[in-house]
């Protein structure tokens, strides 16, 4: 990939997170990704299910014409338990927690790895969704 990145012109580094979700008899052994509302039972109570699997945050390098150059950085992780962001905000002020301890730190890690791999930070244009809108980035 480094040889392909040495060409002239800007390189788009597209970052996003995806989840690999699995069904297992003992889901706690592979990590939690999120909880979902799976409808209602016949008795009327909510059927809330916990999804388990592995999360991946990747950075794909592409040219301005959309030609993929390869993965510039990848990070895999699991969660011991999932609490929504609203539940967390009730107990902890997110602005007082260091970025290195947050899950959103993956954006900075991938940015640094991508720049190190390409070797020309002035040519890298990093693109992310609204989740990447963090002060440290």
What residues fall within each predicted segment?
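Conserved, well-structured functional cores that handle cations and Mg-NTP chemistry
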Residues: 1-137
